[in-house]
């Protein structure tokens, strides 16, 4: 038997409101109970969205991620906050549902189904988040995004036909197509996680920023469960729609974040706050042990987006004061992938230290980096994974594509907001 009590008026206060109690007695037998009736606030302390667009071979991993989230919710972590799940079941279909706690279990209620979805379009994404705002209004919003990732590189510029030839060499049409990083699967089935489906239906970071701006949301954090998304170019694109970026500068194993461990840190203090230290620490500690000794690889960092524009000002000074970057074969840069030739992503600080020899500017850079990517959030295992275990010798927690000679990078990077702000 289900008993539903509906209040006549909304609870416009920030806390639960006691409405009274109900005495219940079963018609058969003598069982009795008194139930306290409370009304949750109309506007939740926070709404967190788990956003899982279609990502091809990651779908089964998404289902495991959802089960891990449900384990956490069953621990009664939400209280008056809300957790919504957007899941695409194909390239064009999806559902929006709510996960909630009920008597020691996590339950799921479907809110809306979608047909003919195209989440590469800003209008579609805006529509999804407009509905989320109406359905689950909150004082603050957070989001986790699970998919394949390719940092800032535009979907239109990263298809196989564009190739990844070194800039200035043979034209793209004559170069052989190469695999994406998520197509490299080890003999025992392990692979890693472009912000999209791994095909042509991918969402540009600029499109996502445009869509969320139109929806009138500024997230407390975007947690990217994707490869390569801790990138200074990405952070600049998204700086106005989120306060923090939680992401990895390198590849993320296909398993993704351990959500049963991470999710409680997104609902601390009775569901009203979040703990970035706890998120990063739980990710790091999980991957120190994950499938050891072959796949225990993980790196994470947090970018404070309110500091990114100041970092751009410092980088402009460095670029203006420095000659063009020339690679030193004796001091190879820390790279964050070994699958694309030429490499696309390098450690930002390592690059700056080889680009610039002005002591005062380097000091200013270090100070600004500490504000932009705080050291306490920069955690990594000894190795990261990229078609095998690769050593991390220096780690600022954030990448740049500036030194790359990849045709895809060279043909597109000058159009990024970061490049324009720093040159």
Tell what function each PLM region has:
Residues 170-423:
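Terminal, contiguous helix-loop blocks that mediate binding/assembly
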Residues 57-62, 92-95, 151-155, 229-234, ...:
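Extracytoplasmic/secreted cell-surface and envelope-processing proteins
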Residues 35-41:
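Interdomain boundary/hinge segments at the C-termini of tandem beta-sandwich modules
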Residues 47-52, 82-87, 141-145, 220-224, ...:
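Structural recognition of the beta-strand scaffold that forms the well-ordered cores
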Residues 86-113, 140, 144-199:
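Surface-exposed loop and adjacent secondary-structure segments within mature catalytic domains
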Residues 41-139, 414, 419:
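N-terminal extension/subdomain marker
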Residues 3-7, 15-28:
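A short beta-strand micro-motif common to beta-rich folds, especially ectodomain repeats
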């Amino acid at each position: 038997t289900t008993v539903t009590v509906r209040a006549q008026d909304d609870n416009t206060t920030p806390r639960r409101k006691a409405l009274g109690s109900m005495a219940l007695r079963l018609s058969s037998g003598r069982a009795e109970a008194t139930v306290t009736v409370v009304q949750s606030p109309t506007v939740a302390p926070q709404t967190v969205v788990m956003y899982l667009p279609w990502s091809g071979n990651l779908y089964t991993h998404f289902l495991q991620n959802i089960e891990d989230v449900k384990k956490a919710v069953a621990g009664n972590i939400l209280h008056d906050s809300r957790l919504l799940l957007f899941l695409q079941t194909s390239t064009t279909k999806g559902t929006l549902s709510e996960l909630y706690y009920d008597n020691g279990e996590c339950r799921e209620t479907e809110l809306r189904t979608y047909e003919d979805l195209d989440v590469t379009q800003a209008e579609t994404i805006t529509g999804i988040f407009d509905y989320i705002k109406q359905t689950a209004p909150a004082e603050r919003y957070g989001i986790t995004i699970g998919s394949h990732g390719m940092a800032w590189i535009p979907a239109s510029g990263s298809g196989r036909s564009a190739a990844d030839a070194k800039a200035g060499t043979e034209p793209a049409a004559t170069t052989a197509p190469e695999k994406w990083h998520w197509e490299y699967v080890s003999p025992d089935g392990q692979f890693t996680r472009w912000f999209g489906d791994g095909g042509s239906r991918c969402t540009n970071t600029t499109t996502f920023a445009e869509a969320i701006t139109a929806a009138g949301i500024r997230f407390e954090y975007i947690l990217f469960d994707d490869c390569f998304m801790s990138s200074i170019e990405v952070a600049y694109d998204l700086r106005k729609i989120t306060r923090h970026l939680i992401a990895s500068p390198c590849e993320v194993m296909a398993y993704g974040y351990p959500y049963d461990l991470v999710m409680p840190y997104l609902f601390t203090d009775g569901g009203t706050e979040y703990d970035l230290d706890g998120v990063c620490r739980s990710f790091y500690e999980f991957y120190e042990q994950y499938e050891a000794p072959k796949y225990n690889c993980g790196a994470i960092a947090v970018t404070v987006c309110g500091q990114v524009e100041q970092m751009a000002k410092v980088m402009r000074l460095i670029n203006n004061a420095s000659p063009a970057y020339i690679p030193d074969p004796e001091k190879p840069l820390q790279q964050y992938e070994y699958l694309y030739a030429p490499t696309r992503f390098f450690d930002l600080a390592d690059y700056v230290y080889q680009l610039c020899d002005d002591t005062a500017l380097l000091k200013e850079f270090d100070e600004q980096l500490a504000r932009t990517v705080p050291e306490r959030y920069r955690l990594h295992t000894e190795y990261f994974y990229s078609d095998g275990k690769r050593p991390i010798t220096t780690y600022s927690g954030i990448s740049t594509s500036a030194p790359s000679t990849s045709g895809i990078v060279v043909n597109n990077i000058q159009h990024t907001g970061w490049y324009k702000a720093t040159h």
